[in-house]
């Protein structure tokens, strides 16, 4: 199936991480079905699924109560292009659950969420430059796809190819955990925001030092810079309220997903 896909899909996959080159496979697994903790490929090989669709299948594949909820919802329609009661109920639950959240904007992807959060920070602070960290992945928007630790790196491509210098010159990328470099940059530049994965997943699910995150919080307040926690992966997992609840550190903005 991989060879059949390659003439029609660039690289044979629709996101680089699915190529499986980082685990030294010649071809990705083409999934056919899944149930509970197991997944079957097109050749009927069964696997214990540790990928879990890269996060969303935290309850396993096709639990009965989820299937029932989806079936009940689809009977009322699949897409309206209008506000719904469910959006309001979800927003209220998120405000109640996640420490930093006061209001919620729903998006269709993690990339759109992080891109919107950075745009909001720039608008609020009236500054352009942002700080991110090596190995932290925040989606594939141009400004954030710099030293991202994404699956692009396992395919042999530089993650900034195709991005004009004028776009990423306002993205400052620093070593993760180096608070001294952060402070130096905050002192010398007007920084709109710092965006960080509080638990970076794309460089090995590294648990951050609480002291580093606490220092980020203190220094951003000091210099009028917004702190964004990208919790697309860590949210609801390490604690119901995400890594910000787990570490006891409240950012200005956060993104959630999966």
Task: Please place each PLM-identified region on the residue numbering.
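Active-site-adjacent loop/helix segments that line or gate small-molecule/cofactor pockets in enzymes
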Residues: 1-33, 174
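Active-site and channel-lining beta-strand-loop segments
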Residues: 28-49
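Glycine-rich loop-to-alpha-helix module at the N-terminal edge of alpha/beta enzyme cores
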Residues: 46-128
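Conserved PLP-anchoring active-site segment centered on the Schiff-base-forming lysine
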Residues: 123-145
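PLP-dependent aminotransferase-class I/II
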Residues: 137-199, 207
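Catalytic PLP-binding core of fold-type I/II PLP enzymes
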Residues: 206-239
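Conserved active-site segment immediately N-terminal to the catalytic lysine
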Residues: 244-258
């Amino acid at each position: 199936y991989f060879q059949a896909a390659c003439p029609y899909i660039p690289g044979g996959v629709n996101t680089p991480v699915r190529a499986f080159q980082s685990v030294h496979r010649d071809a990705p697994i083409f999934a056919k079905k899944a149930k509970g903790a197991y997944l079957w490929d097109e050749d009927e090989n069964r696997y214990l699924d540790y990928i879990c669709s890269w996060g969303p299948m935290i309850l396993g594949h096709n639990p009965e109560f989820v299937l029932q909820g989806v079936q009940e919802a689809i009977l009322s329609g699949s897409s309206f292009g209008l506000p719904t009661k469910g959006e309001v109920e979800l927003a209220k639950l998120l405000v109640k659950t996640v420490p930093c959240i006061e209001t919620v904007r729903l998006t269709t992807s993690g990339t759109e969420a992080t891109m919107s959060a950075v745009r909001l920070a720039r608008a609020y602070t009236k500054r352009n430059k942002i700080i991110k960290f090596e190995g932290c992945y925040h989606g594939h928007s141009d400004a954030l796809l710099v030293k991202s630790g994404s699956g692009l790196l396992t395919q042999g491509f530089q993650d900034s190819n195709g991005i004009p210098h004028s776009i990423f010159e306002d993205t400052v990328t620093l070593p993760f955990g180096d608070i001294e470099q952060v402070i130096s940059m905050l002192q010398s530049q007007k920084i709109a925001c710092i965006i960080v994965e509080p638990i970076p997943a794309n460089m090995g699910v590294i648990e951050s030092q609480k002291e580093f995150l606490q220092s980020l919080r203190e220094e951003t307040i000091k210099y009028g810079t917004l702190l964004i926690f990208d919790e697309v992966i860590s949210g609801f997992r390490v604690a119901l309220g995400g890594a910000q609840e787990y570490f006891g550190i409240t950012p200005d903005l956060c993104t959630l997903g999966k």
